């Protein structure tokens, strides 16, 4: 709360993950203490229920599910519908780093931005186009990313990667 007050002159767009993920009920207290500050969280929540809980109680402004941790594309669709019905925005945690997150962000209403980062093992300063990524995964250019329209979400999976499966 004190940090939020000290940062007011900088007009932060939002404060992200202000509390540990297990503290969902504490967000209700935080919301009452700093009602004017946009709050975002959810990247370490699992399944749909925490998002429903947060949206139905109006304790955050931006839900940030991680597509790999909440249960995949089906869960993201449910969360997007929950958020839309509550008037809450969704920004997928690391959504720009996977083709599934890219397609969900591009195709679902209520998702206004995409968070994009490269693999954590890639050295700082390496251009995005040179970072390790799954073949067929689009990369951002000039602040924009367009998901592939190729079959299979655009992933380029080669049979030689799975010799036992295709033998």
Which residues does each predicted region cover?
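Shared catalytic-loop signature of beta/alpha-barrel
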Residues: 5, 11, 19-144, 148
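Extended hydrophobic packing segments that form well-structured cores
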Residues: 151-167
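Short glycine/proline-centered loop/turn elements that form peptide/ligand docking sites
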Residues: 2
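Generic detection of intrinsically disordered/low-complexity segments and helix-coil linkers/edges
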Residues: 8, 39, 155-159
């Amino acid at each position: 709360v004190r940090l939020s007050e000290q940062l007011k002159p900088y007009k932060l767009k939002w404060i992200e993950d202000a509390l540990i993920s297990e503290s969902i009920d504490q967000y209700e207290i935080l919301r009452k203490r700093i009602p004017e500050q946009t709050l975002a969280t959810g990247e370490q929540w699992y399944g749909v229920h925490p998002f429903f809980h947060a949206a139905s109680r109006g304790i955050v402004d931006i839900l940030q599910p991680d597509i790999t941790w909440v249960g995949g594309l089906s869960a993201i669709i449910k969360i997007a519908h929950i958020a839309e019905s509550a008037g809450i925005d969704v920004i997928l945690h690391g959504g720009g780093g996977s083709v599934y997150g890219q397609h969900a962000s591009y195709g679902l209403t209520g998702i206004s931005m995409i968070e994009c980062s490269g693999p954590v093992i890639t050295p700082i300063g390496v251009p995005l186009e040179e970072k390790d990524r799954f073949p067929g995964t689009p990369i951002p250019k000039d602040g924009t990313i367009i998901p592939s329209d190729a079959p299979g979400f655009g992933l380029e999976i080669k049979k030689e990667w799975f010799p036992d499966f295709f033998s």
